[in-house]
């Protein structure tokens, strides 16, 4: 851990500065700035706490060794403290491993139906509900930005904004960033009269939505803005005016829709926020080979062959093919009980980061 000393010193100094800023009433006059400082403070607090425990244990070990030199009964305490220091040292190494800079961010999540027609659209709706239920379990805020429904009430596509309310170091992105990819379902469709199991798929795309996206330069001449009549639920009159907005970024082909705000101006403003977040994510992807490799796991086309996860209804089984995770509680997972799976994905990611340091 000697090589980490400079990093620790820098973090301790930053921690002290953040403490002072959080105690300053003027900071809290700017809610955005206060949230940013609070999130960074929450991110480094576990590092500082673990480091202080490690230093205290080292001091205790030195004292125990001196006592053990005169009294053999202290030998057990020396062994116990040695083990404790080893655990704390490994924990600190883990905490100092490179973190995803977006872990504290909120997200935009898109669900798209793929091959399978109505069954795929119904499954896409099941996935959207799963993420909504998961967000509710964590006290997060979910906003439906736009959706296109199928004849049977499924989703051809749906776009959700999911935001946390606190300053946790691990925000929505930290938990749901692994969800991007093709999700495959095996079940008897409601349209199947012979009781045969069919396979279809839906795709999920996840993008971080940072607090600050001002650095993204968007040229108005690169945009095509279409307005149309909202098809979703909204305020009074939403179905009688062309309030929904679709923005196409011509250079990249990115399309963003928003239809659930009360006015066309509000829908356009929200769509521009989502577009800025997507363009920022795209720029970061292009700038980083590692990020590009990670993003490659997210779908470009919804093809049943490039799956990350399978939902098998006859066996009540869910299988994540990236980490060989299997569980027979599909009904609970679809009701938002995702934490065991997401914990396993996060642990695999953490191990990979440690191996690359």
Swiss-Prot record:
Methylated by PrmC. Methylation increases the termination efficiency of RF1. One of its GO terms (molecular function) is translation release factor activity, codon specific. The modification N5-methylglutamine is found at residue 236. HAMAP family: Rel_fac_1. It is found in: Cytoplasm. InterPro entries: PCRF, Pep_chain_release_fac_I, Pep_chain_release_fac_I_sf, Prokaryotic/Mito_RF, RF-1. The lineage of its organism: Bacteria, Bacillati, Actinomycetota, Actinomycetes, Mycobacteriales. It holds the Pfam family RF-1. It comes from the Bacteria. PROSITE patterns: RF_PROK_I. Its main location: cytoplasm. Peptide chain release factor 1 directs the termination of translation in response to the peptide chain termination codons UAG and UAA. Keywords: Cytoplasm, Methylation, Protein biosynthesis. One of its GO terms (cellular component) is cytoplasm. This is Peptide chain release factor 1. Belongs to the prokaryotic/mitochondrial release factor family.
């Amino acid at each position: 851990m000697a090589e980490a000393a400079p990093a620790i010193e820098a973090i301790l100094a930053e921690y002290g500065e953040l403490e002072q800023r959080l105690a300053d009433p003027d900071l809290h006059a700017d809610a955005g700035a206060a949230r940013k400082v609070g999130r960074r403070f929450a991110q480094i607090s576990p590092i500082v706490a673990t480091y202080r425990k490690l230093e205290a244990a080292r001091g205790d070990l030195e004292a125990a060794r001196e006592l053990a030199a005169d009294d053999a009964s202290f030998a057990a305490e020396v062994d116990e403290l040695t083990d404790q220091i080893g655990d704390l040292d490994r924990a600190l190494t883990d905490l100092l491993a490179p973190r995803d800079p977006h872990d504290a961010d909120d997200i935009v999540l898109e669900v798209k139906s793929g091959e399978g027609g109505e069954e795929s659209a119904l499954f896409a709706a099941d996935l959207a509900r799963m993420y909504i239920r998961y967000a509710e379990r964590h006290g997060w805020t979910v906003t439906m930005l736009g959706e296109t429904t199928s004849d049977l009430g499924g989703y051809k596509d749906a776009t959700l904004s999911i935001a946390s309310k606190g300053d946790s170091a691990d925000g929505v992105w930290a938990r749901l960033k692994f969800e991007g990819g093709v999700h495959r379902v095996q079940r008897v469709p409601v349209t199947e009269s012979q009781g045969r199991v069919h396979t279809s798929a839906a795709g999920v795309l996840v993008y971080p939505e940072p607090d600050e996206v001002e650095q993204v330069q968007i040229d108005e001449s690169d945009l095509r803005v279409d307005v149309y009549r909202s098809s979703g639920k909204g305020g009074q009159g939403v179905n009688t005016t062309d309030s929904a907005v679709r923005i196409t970024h011509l250079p990249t082909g990115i399309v963003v829709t928003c239809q659930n705000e009360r006015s066309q101006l509000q829908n356009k403003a929200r769509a521009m926020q989502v577009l800025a977040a997507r363009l920022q994510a795209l720029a970061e992807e292009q700038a980083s080979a590692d990020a590009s490799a990670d993003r490659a796991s997210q779908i470009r086309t919804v093809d049943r062959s490039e799956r990350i996860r399978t939902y098998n209804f006859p066996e009540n089984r869910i299988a994540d093919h990236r980490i060989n995770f299997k569980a027979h509680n599909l009904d609970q997972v679809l009701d938002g009980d995702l934490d065991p799976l997401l914990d396993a994905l996060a642990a695999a990611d953490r191990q990979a980061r440690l191996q690359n340091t």
